[in-house]
Regions:
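Non-catalytic terminal regions with compositionally biased, polar/charged low complexity
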Residues: 39-53, 57-186
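Trp/Gly-enriched beta-strand surface patches
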Residues: 1-35, 101
Length: 186
């Protein structure tokens, strides 16, 4: 998260946040694992009306993996960050306070509570839509007619999806209408 005057930050272990295998990358935060979390108190700035995204990296190696965090173009209702890592990934993180379409970065459109896009060497590796209807980047689209939690991700050169409801996935010129499912091949 970008810095802010009057901000207090607390690190906590929250309860597990997902019960469905395949819904989160690497099945993180499934029982019995806790969810690493931060509690942020901000005087005079309500997160309900001013969104934020944070990056927290705990590491045991001699050096961190996060090389840099860059704030992306946003507006009062949408915030975005680009996170560059030592292992060659670029992660784009988006958060909004409304359910309108936003364009927080070039060639990206987003309508949801949380959006994540991961690229490696400019090639898409993952898209995650948290409680939303659409996430688009270039020729890749993840969308639904209702709010869903959904992801498309590449594992060992094969594309998979997970979703809590029906989704439409566009990859280049190919479009697939998919039902709810977890760790399903595309």
């Amino acid at each position: 998260m970008t810095g802010g005057e009057g901000r207090e930050v607390y690190r906590v272990d929250a309860p597990p946040t997902t019960m469905n295998k395949g819904l989160t990358p690497g099945d993180i935060c499934m029982p019995p694992m806790p969810t690493p979390a931060l509690i942020v108190r901000q005087e005079g700035n309500n997160a309900q009306t001013h969104p934020f995204v944070s990056v927290y990296e705990a590491y045991k190696k001699s050096s961190p993996n996060v090389l840099g965090v860059e704030a992306l173009q946003g507006d009062d209702d949408c915030i975005g960050l680009k996170v560059n890592t030592a292992d060659g990934y670029a992660d784009y993180l988006f958060s909004v306070t409304d359910m309108q379409a936003h364009h927080p970065s070039g060639h990206v459109s987003f309508c949801g509570s949380l959006g994540v896009i991961r690229e490696k060497e400019g090639k898409l590796q993952l898209m995650y839509l948290g409680c939303g209807r659409s996430l688009k980047k270039g020729n890749f689209v993840l969308e639904s007619d209702r709010d869903v939690y959904a992801a498309i991700y590449m594992r060992h050169g094969v594309w998979y999806y997970s979703a809590t409801g029906p989704v439409r996935v566009k990859m280049g010129k190919e479009t697939k209408d998919l039902d709810e499912g977890y760790n399903q091949k595309l």
